[in-house]
C-alpha cells in the first residue's frame, strides 16, 4: 500500500493524531516503522484492528474495517 506519516494515517483512519501516536507506540507496531514513517499494508491494518479490539476503541474499528475491505 505504501509508506505514510502518522498524520496521513490518522486522516485515513479518521482518528486524532495523538491517539494514533499513542497506539503506534505499542511494541507490536515496531516492525512497520521505516524511519519516521510507517509502512502501511493489509497486515498493518489487521494488527491495528486487533489492537483496537483489545483497547475497546469501537468508534475507530469501523473505519479500519472499511480500509481493509477497500484495500
Model-identified regions with their sequence ranges:
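Hydrophobic transmembrane signal anchors and adjacent membrane-proximal interface regions, especially
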Residues: 8-11, 30-31, 38, 66
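Residues in the recognition helix of alpha-helical DNA-binding motifs
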Residues: 23
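Alpha-helical DNA-recognition elements
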Residues: 26
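Short helix-start
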Residues: 30-57
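Helix-turn-helix/homeodomain-like alpha-helical modules used for DNA recognition
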Residues: 53-71
Amino acid at each position: 500500500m505504501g509508506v505514510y506519516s502518522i498524520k496521513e494515517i490518522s486522516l485515513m483512519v479518521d482518528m486524532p493524531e495523538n491517539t494514533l501516536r499513542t497506539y503506534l507506540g505499542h511494541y507490536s507496531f515496531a516492525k512497520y516503522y521505516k524511519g519516521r514513517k510507517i509502512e502501511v499494508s493489509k497486515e498493518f491494518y489487521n494488527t491495528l484492528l486487533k489492537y483496537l479490539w483489545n483497547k475497546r476503541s469501537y468508534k475507530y474499528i469501523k473505519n479500519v474495517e472499511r480500509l481493509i475491505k477497500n484495500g
